[in-house]
């Protein structure tokens, strides 16, 4: 996969871009929000300010999120749904309040369409093991794309081994965006699901969900969206998208790790069997058999990640207060800025890595090329200057410099 050897520069998300110390940045949202993030206040590498550009992997957390989690641990820590005492009631209210916030954030029709999971990976596995086992037979088809994260490939490969389903992969077009015509050509009467990234974590392209959904509906297929790179960066409306399933991870939304969510249309969730067994997902338990709770409880077996869910709710509050339209606009400016401005330090790092001596003097080239003009640099995904929708992230390789070497140089370069 391309992502294994790429260096990623992410000028992405209001919860991260405030770490970008660019003296002529397009607007000041980043600088105004930087103080909200305790981790960005530290000094590193000879007393230089921390500049964090790895949000596509995990985002940093604002004080509001950290404080909400600490407050719960210090004041309200108790199990949810299982006690009548004050702490349990308060903990349950906060936990379910986070579900309400997520439902509003993605415009779900009902709070019951939001299932808490450990993250997007678990959410996709839940769909594969519950919906997939109930609806996919030998010879049925799942259409994916070659740009998918491993989390949206491996669960379907496991089901392929178990059930004999067929996996098909849509290719990219000349701009390294989804080739919708090729995707359509893969769809047949046996196609039951199309599972695609809303935004590619490596290519940055924003996939045309409406075209994918239209093609799926014509074949009677369901649609799953991996929205890890879209939910924190742009307005996402599941009703407008008309997807059947959508997954995202809290740690990419300014929230904690260990929590995420699955959105599913209620008419599908109601028909899906439990994936895991345990407390809370049952209605009645007898020695001979058990009956199961309705969604979302049916899919939340055992004690959930309560504090993490509350932290995710606080992250949603934080993003909502900024406004997702404002976040999207700012990130578009940052992405264009990243591609169009001169990149002398990156060029210097490339030259230093490529030089047998790696001398310090090689870090200050006379030329000031733009990112796309650095010799030997291979950029992935569409160029935002071409007017093609894409996220504010950049992945690249160099033809002679190993990604690990270049990443090490970039990690220590002056901000």
Predicted segments with their positions:
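Intrinsic-disorder-associated interaction segments
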Residues: 2-3, 26
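Sec-dependent signal peptide recognition
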Residues: 3-12
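Pyridoxal 5′-phosphate
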Residues: 13-16, 22-347, 351-415
């Amino acid at each position: 996969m391309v992502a294994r050897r790429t260096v990623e520069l992410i000028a992405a998300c209001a919860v991260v871009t405030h770490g970008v110390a660019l003296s002529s940045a397009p607007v000041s949202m980043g600088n105004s929000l930087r103080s909200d993030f305790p981790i960005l206040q530290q000094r590193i590498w000879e007393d230089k300010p921390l500049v964090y550009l790895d949000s596509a992997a995990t985002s940093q957390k604002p004080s509001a999120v950290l404080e909400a989690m600490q407050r719960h641990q210090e004041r309200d820590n108790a199990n949810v749904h299982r006690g009548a005492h004050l702490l349990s009631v308060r903990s349950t209210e906060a936990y379910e309040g986070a579900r309400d916030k997520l439902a509003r954030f993605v415009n779900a029709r009902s709070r019951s369409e939001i299932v808490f999971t450990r993250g997007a990976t678990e959410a996709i596995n839940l769909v594969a093991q519950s919906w997939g086992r109930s609806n996919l037979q030998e010879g049925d088809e799942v259409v994916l794309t070659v740009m998918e994260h491993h989390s949206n490939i491996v669960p379907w490969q496991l089901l392929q081994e178990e059930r004999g389903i067929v996996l098909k992969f849509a290719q990219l077009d000349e701009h390294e965006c989804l080739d919708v015509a090729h995707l359509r050509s893969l769809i047949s009467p046996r196609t039951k699901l199309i599972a695609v990234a809303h935004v590619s974590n490596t290519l940055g392209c924003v996939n045309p969900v409406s075209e994918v959904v239209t093609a799926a509906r014509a074949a009677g297929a369901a649609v799953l969206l991996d929205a890890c790179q879209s939910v924190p960066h742009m307005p996402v409306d599941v009703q407008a998208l008309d997807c059947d399933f959508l997954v995202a991870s809290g740690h990419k939304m300014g929230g904690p790790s260990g929590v995420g969510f699955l959105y599913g249309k209620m008419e599908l969730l109601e028909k899906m069997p439990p994936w895991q067994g345990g407390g809370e997902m049952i209605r009645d338990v007898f020695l001979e058999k058990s009956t199961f709770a309705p969604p979302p409880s049916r899919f939340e077996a055992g004690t959930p990640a309560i504090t993490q869910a509350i932290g995710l709710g606080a992250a949603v509050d934080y993003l909502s207060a900024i406004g997702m339209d404002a976040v999207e606009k700012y990130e578009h400016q940052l992405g264009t800025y990243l591609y169009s401005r001169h990149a002398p330090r990156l060029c210097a790092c490339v030259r230093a890595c490529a030089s047998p001596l790696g001398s310090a003097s090689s870090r200050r080239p006379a030329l000031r090329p733009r990112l796309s003009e650095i010799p030997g640099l291979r950029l992935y995904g569409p160029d935002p200057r071409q007017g093609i929708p894409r996220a504010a992230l950049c992945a690249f390789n160099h033809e002679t410099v190993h990604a690990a070497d270049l990443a090490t140089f970039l990690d220590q370069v002056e901000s």
